[in-house]
């Protein structure tokens, strides 16, 4: 059988692409080296932020707004346990923070619902937070967090129900191109399609080592908290920048545990297989201490944690482009630790590509040619 589309990597973007492409009537094969959702990529750990006024640049705002619409649609399939939780997101940092300047600019350009607070205003609204006098907060009322593993599980189930073929726990070992399309090699045999999507996270380096993607081991951890830090008490998700420039992110507490991670830093690795578990690097459990001591002093000890992997591009912007020399193969990689919130819209973009539809978005900033 020759498929319309083969998806290599069925984590966040791949799961979404499988669903949207199958729903569009295409004959699709989803593949993954493991059984998604799983612990081997970048999507585990239960939750991911979704921010609209984007500190990484306003070029992302049209994408994230469409992503939000798609997340809302997906959440309707899990009304008892919604995939999107509108907790709000407070972005904290020095008044001269470049990241916060981008958040404010994005909000102004796209007329987003963002409230600016000074240090006293932040601490009055959320007494659990402590910030210096020179700090400001930009509160995104309509933002919040996503249940990442539930989202992937839902997409995969919906795709399967729609007739999508799924080949999991079966790594793709090679990709070949010829006049008839794309062929993948696996332990289960060879499969052919007219087009392919490669969205395998850091595993992309095993198939396409020439791509400018650097795997980086990252960790996040859960710390002892209480009901004051919960959504029920209106405690928000957050990003926070320390005076030295270190960037952190976190979520409201659930079951008396607050999850937090450090966005910058980490350990450079050469392949996804080199990632060691949480606590095998001495700094893992204490990485968030500088932020917790200064900003959330009421949070207690580290309870447990996990390691994940960023697939960093050189400029930490996404790579969304066809494979050089092969217009029938779309790459979605280099998501650099801020990609999950876009998984829905990136999956839709992939499905449009498979149908020969022109994207509704300007993808020029994400072209591989910027690295030449």
Swiss-Prot record:
SUPFAM superfamilies tied to this protein: FAD-linked reductases, C-terminal domain, FAD/NAD(P)-binding domain
Amino-acid positions noted as binding FAD in the UniProt annotation, renumbered to this chain? 4-34
- The chain residues annotated with the modification S-8alpha-FAD cysteine are 308
Q: What class of enzyme is it?
A: oxidoreductase
List the cofactors.
FAD
What EC number(s) would the UniProt record show?
A: 1.5.3.-
Any keyword Flavoprotein? yes
Show the Pfam families listed in the entry: DAO (PF01266)
The annotation note on the cofactor reads: Binds 1 FAD per subunit.
Give the UniProt keywords, A-Z.
FAD, Flavoprotein, Oxidoreductase
Q: Which GO terms describe its cellular component?
A: cytosol
Q: Does the keyword Coiled coil apply?
A: no
InterPro entries according to UniProt: FAD-dep_OxRdtase, FAD/NAD-bd_sf, Me_Trp_Oxase_MTOX, MTOX
Q: Molecular function terms in GO for this entry?
A: flavin adenine dinucleotide binding; N-methyl-L-amino-acid oxidase activity; sarcosine oxidase activity
Q: Which reaction does it catalyse?
A: N(alpha)-methyl-L-tryptophan + O2 + H2O = L-tryptophan + formaldehyde + H2O2
Q: Which family does it belong to?
A: Belongs to the MSOX/MTOX family. MTOX subfamily.
Q: How is this protein organized at the quaternary level?
A: Monomer.
Q: What does this protein do?
A: Catalyzes the oxidative demethylation of N-methyl-L-tryptophan.
Q: Which HAMAP family match?
A: MTOX
Q: What is this protein called?
A: N-methyl-L-tryptophan oxidase
Gene that produces this protein = solA
């Amino acid at each position: 059988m020759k498929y319309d589309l083969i998806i290599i990597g069925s984590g966040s973007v791949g799961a979404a692409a499988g669903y949207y492409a199958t729903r569009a009537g295409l004959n699709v094969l989803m593949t993954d080296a493991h059984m998604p959702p799983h612990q081997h990529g970048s999507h585990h750990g239960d939750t991911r932020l979704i921010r609209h006024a984007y500190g990484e640049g306003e070029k992302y705002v049209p994408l994230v707004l469409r992503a939000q619409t798609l997340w809302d649609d997906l959440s309707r399939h899990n009304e008892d346990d919604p995939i999107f939780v509108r907790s709000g997101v407070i972005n904290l940092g020095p008044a001269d923070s470049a990241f916060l300047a981008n958040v404010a600019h994005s909000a102004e350009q796209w007329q987003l619902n963002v409230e600016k607070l000074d240090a006293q205003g932040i601490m009055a609204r959320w007494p659990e937070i402590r910030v210096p006098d020179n700090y400001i907060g930009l509160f995104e009322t309509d933002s919040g967090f996503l249940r990442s593993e539930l989202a992937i599980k839902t997409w995969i189930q919906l795709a399967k129900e729609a007739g999508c073929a799924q080949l999991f726990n079966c790594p793709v070992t090679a990709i070949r191109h010829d006049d008839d399309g794309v062929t993948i090699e696996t332990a289960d045999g060879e499969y052919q399609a007219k087009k392919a999507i490669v969205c395998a996270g850091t595993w992309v380096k095993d198939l396409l080592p020439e791509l400018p993607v650097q795997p980086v081991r990252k960790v996040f951890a859960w710390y002892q908290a209480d009901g004051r830090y919960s959504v029920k008490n209106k405690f928000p998700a957050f990003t926070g920048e320390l005076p030295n420039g270190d960037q952190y992110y976190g979520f409201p507490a659930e079951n008396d545990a607050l999850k937090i991670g450090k966005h910058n830093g980490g350990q450079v690795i050469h392949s996804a297989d080199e990632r060691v578990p949480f606590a095998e690097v001495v700094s893992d459990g204490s990485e968030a201490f500088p932020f917790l001591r200064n900003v959330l002093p009421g949070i207690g000890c580290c309870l447990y944690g996990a390691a994940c992997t960023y697939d960093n591009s050189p400029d930490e912007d996404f790579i969304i482009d066809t494979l050089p020399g092969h217009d029938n193969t779309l790459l979605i990689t280099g998501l650099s630790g801020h990609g999950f919130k876009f998984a829905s819209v990136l999956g839709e973009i992939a499905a449009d590509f498979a149908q020969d539809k022109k994207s509704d978005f300007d993808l020029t900033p994400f072209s591989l040619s910027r690295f030449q």
